[in-house]
From Swiss-Prot:
Xref: InterPro entries: QueC, Rossmann-like_a/b/a_fold
Cofactor(s) named in the record: Zn(2+)
Binding of Zn(2+), residues: 183, 191, 194, 197
PANTHER family per record: 7-CYANO-7-DEAZAGUANINE SYNTHASE
EC number: 6.3.4.20
GO molecular function, one term: ATP binding
Keywords: ATP-binding, Ligase, Metal-binding, Nucleotide-binding, Zinc
Residues reported to bind ATP: 7-17
Superkingdom field: Archaea
Name this polypeptide is given: 7-cyano-7-deazaguanine synthase
Gene this chain is encoded by: queC
Membership in a protein family: Belongs to the QueC family.
Pathway membership: Purine metabolism; 7-cyano-7-deazaguanine biosynthesis
Length: 217
């Protein structure tokens, strides 16, 4: 079965890549460079795909920095610190980002004859990111049935899982989490304070494992 995966280089999508390979999918990965501060995730995605011999496209979407400003992309906006579920984390929303990503990934999937499109939204995303909610996934799934004569199935298997659940699954699959990136601040080492870092650290604690990344003191 041919499938396309939106691969950021973070924990969730990297785990899903290993998961799909384990299930026997013939996976092609697509990564989007939208001028995010945390570009290290792109390098992680490249390294993972090279290691696993996965076809990998990187698409330049730096225009989102102009059209859809966010603290994830703008130098004049600080990435908020605190828990992932805090209201301040809404500053990290890139307006309509996943709809743009999914639309382009759908074109790629249809173009290469893949019948399945995957992305790794999970339960912890629902409160902050509108384009990770079940209702959004349902609407996009309907759109993909209508957008082309070739039927494309949108699959979001981690939609109701916590990040801790995903970490446990990934550890069982042998995911190399040292080659993933979560921190939104884009520094040499993870900050340990932004929402992405706090959720990642919680996930490893829940999974009973140590995070292999180094954090700022």
């Amino acid at each position: 079965m041919k499938a396309v995966l939106i691969l950021s280089g973070g924990m969730d999508s990297t785990t899903l890549l290993y998961d799909l390979i384990d299930q026997g999918y013939e996976v092609s990965a697509i990564t989007f460079d939208y001028h995010q501060k945390h570009k290290k995730e792109i390098a992680c995605a490249q390294k993972t795909c090279a290691k696993l011999s996965i076809p990998h496209k990187i698409v330049n979407l730096s225009v989102l920095n102009d059209l859809a400003p966010s603290s994830l992309t703008r130098a004049d906006r600080d990435v908020p610190e605190g828990h992932y579920a805090e209201e301040s984390m809404k500053q990290t929303v890139v307006p309509n980002r996943n709809m743009v990503f999914l639309s382009l990934a759908a074109s790629y999937a249809i173009g290469i004859g893949a019948g399945h499109l995957f992305y790794a939204a999970h339960a912890g995303d629902h409160a902050i990111y509108p384009d990770c909610r079940p209702v959004f996934v349902s609407a996009m799934s309907t759109a993909f049935h209508l957008c082309d004569w070739n039927d494309l199935v949108l699959q979001v298997p981690y939609l109701m899982l916590s990040k801790g659940d995903i970490a446990k699954k990934g550890i069982g699959l042998g995911v190399d989490y040292a080659n993933t990136w979560s921190c939104y601040k884009g520094k040499e080492r993870s900050c340990g304070k932004c929402g992405a870092c706090t959720e990642r650290l919680e996930a490893f604690r829940e999974a009973g494992a140590a995070d292999p990344l180094e954090y700022e003191p």
